[in-house]
């Protein structure tokens, strides 16, 4: 299983679980911390970051990143590692982190995934909103440069009426 495969699984998982603005690893930005999320999404009053790990050594190296050693610098009010089975255990997790385990092409086990009513009230982290803002701003700036930003001024398309 490759990093790209796992990133796609993470993005689909977020989308299926109520997060509708998913940014994946291919979306690279310049921000104050240098963090490049494998998958991050935003819903009303909460953000969720998924960090993909394909190997144990990759997971162990992650803790040395500046925004992991200093959690207040990182993105995500909720943070999860996603990996194939038998790479990361619940006992390995840093405080506040959850774990999503993949078998085949789907998340098969979840540790720390909250129920819908908890996303805004029991956040384990106070995300670096400046870094998140920079991430979203970069997306909007790219849309503007491509000439697509005007489309947001027109609202949702009206549903077609069938005769």
Positions of PLM-derived features:
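A conditional alpha-helix N-cap/helix-loop micro-motif detector
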Residues: 3, 32, 60-62
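A short acidic/basic microdomain associated with nuclease active sites
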Residues: 15-32
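A short, well-structured beta->alpha microelement
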Residues: 31-36, 56
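Catalytic cores of nucleic-acid endonucleases
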Residues: 47, 53-102
